[in-house]
Amino acid sequence: MIVFDTGALVALERRKQRALHVWATARRDRTDVVVPGIVIAEWWRERSDAREKVLSSIVVEPVGDRLGRIAGEAIAATSGATVVDAVVMALAAQLGAVVFTSDVDDLEALRAFFPAVRVLAI
């Protein structure tokens, strides 16, 4: 399973080569690409065919109480962490997934709280 952050969705929408490769490989291998719902709020600005295509090919997970609490604890334990990044990492930890991001440094800082999560550049 793969989790994308906002930067990964932007890269996919802009048709960046690595993002397209990861996405196409996941689809070929029937691997779910998952994002927490809060990532959609950060990414979506208006409807476009490119965004609709991306959105139709991913799984959007709601941010419930449990995930929110874990993300909040990660924010408290990690200086400079954002809510969206913490939720992305918490979801990846919960799913046993790899995170693809354009902001490796930001998410690597959260690995102190989520040491089992692999963070890869998109």
Regions found by a protein language model. Give the residues of each.
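Short, well-structured N-terminal submotif of metal-dependent ribonuclease cores
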Residues: 1-35, 42-59
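Short beta-strand scaffold positions
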Residues: 35, 62, 83, 101-102
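Short loop/helix-cap segments at secondary-structure boundaries that form the rim of catalytic
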Residues: 52-55, 107-114
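Acidic catalytic patch
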Residues: 59-78
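Short, flexible helix/strand-to-coil boundary loops that buttress conserved ligand/catalytic motifs
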Residues: 13, 47, 75, 111-114
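Alpha-helix capping/helix-boundary segments
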Residues: 8-9, 39-40, 67, 87-88, ...
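Short hydrophobic/aromatic-enriched beta-strand-loop microsegments
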Residues: 115-122
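Acidic, metal-associated active-site segment
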Residues: 82-98
